[in-house]
């Protein structure tokens, strides 16, 4: 017999067919929202924070990404949000030098007292990542600034209360796996919060690329029956 298990199909029919060709018919035995109701997972609350920018047109996706990750006020907003949160927090980014390093420096520079702030990316070896995990399990207000590639899967931290999507992502699998980091129940932990940061730079005739990606994430939240709230915040130049 061959058995395959996953919590995150990518939502496309082709992906489902490929897996069924390898393993046979697929069965959905439960849902994340059902596991929450049964008390096996933490209750998830999603705060969608849409940062309203002045209208701006980008010729290609990369131009928009460079604009967003280099936006000082946007990065300060993420810094302030992270430092204001209670509990252990995970800040996820996509690009190490251009964004992750900047966020880490900003957060670490403005933290108060001896609050622990860690920076994890592909260049950090597995042993050090495990040390960070063990320390965070014992802390109550630690911050981990980590790349999606290193912390969206495979890291088991029960004592994690908040996740911040600091970089836009369209990938259904990566988003759901990243949410999975915060759903594990721990001692005295029954609730978790995701802060999904989106950006609206739309003109009258066109939505910007990453806003469309945010709309795709909302579709996923609806499909998974997640509770979410959309809050628009004016990001002045």
Q: Model segments located where?
A:
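Conserved RecA-like P-loop NTPase helicase motor core
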Residues: 122-223
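Conserved interdomain hinge at the start of the Helicase C-terminal
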Residues: 56-94, 98-109
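Short hydrophobic segments within beta-strands
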Residues: 5, 90-94, 120, 166, ...
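Post-DEXD/H (motif II) to motif III coupling segment of the RecA-like Helicase ATP-binding lobe
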Residues: 1-45, 221
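Conserved RecA-like helicase motor-core motifs
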Residues: 90, 104, 108-130
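Loop/turn-to-beta-strand initiation segments
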Residues: 1-3, 88, 139-143
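A short beta-strand-to-loop transition that corresponds to the Sensor-1 phosphate-sensing loop
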Residues: 5-9, 94-96, 146-149
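Long, largely alpha-helical accessory region at the distal end of helicase-like NTP-driven motors
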Residues: 88-89, 226-237
């Amino acid at each position: 017999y061959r058995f395959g298990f996953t919590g995150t199909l990518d939502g496309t029919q082709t992906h489902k067919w490929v897996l069924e060709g390898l393993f046979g018919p697929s069965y959905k035995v439960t849902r994340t929202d059902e596991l929450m109701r049964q008390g096996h997972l933490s209750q998830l609350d999603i705060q969608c924070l849409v940062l309203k920018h002045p209208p701006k047109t980008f010729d290609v996706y990369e131009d928009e990404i460079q604009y967003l990750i280099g936006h000082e006020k946007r990065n300060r907003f993420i810094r302030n949000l992270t430092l204001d949160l209670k509990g252990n927090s995970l800040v996820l980014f996509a690009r190490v030098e251009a964004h992750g390093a900047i966020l880490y420096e900003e957060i670490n520079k403005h933290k108060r007292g001896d609050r622990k702030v860690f920076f994890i990316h592909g260049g950090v070896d597995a042993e050090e990542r495990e040390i960070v995990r063990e320390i965070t399990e014992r802390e109550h207000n630690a911050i981990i600034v980590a790349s999606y590639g290193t912390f969206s899967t495979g890291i088991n931290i029960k004592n994690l209360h908040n996740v911040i999507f600091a970089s836009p992502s369209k990938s259904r699998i990566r988003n759901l796996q990243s949410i999975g980091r915060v759903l594990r129940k721990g001692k005295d932990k029954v609730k978790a919060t995701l802060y999904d940061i989106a950006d609206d730079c739309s003109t009258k005739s066109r939505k910007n690329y990453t806003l469309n990606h945010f709309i795709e994430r909302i579709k996923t939240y609806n499909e998974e029956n997640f509770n979410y709230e959309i809050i628009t915040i004016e990001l002045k130049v």
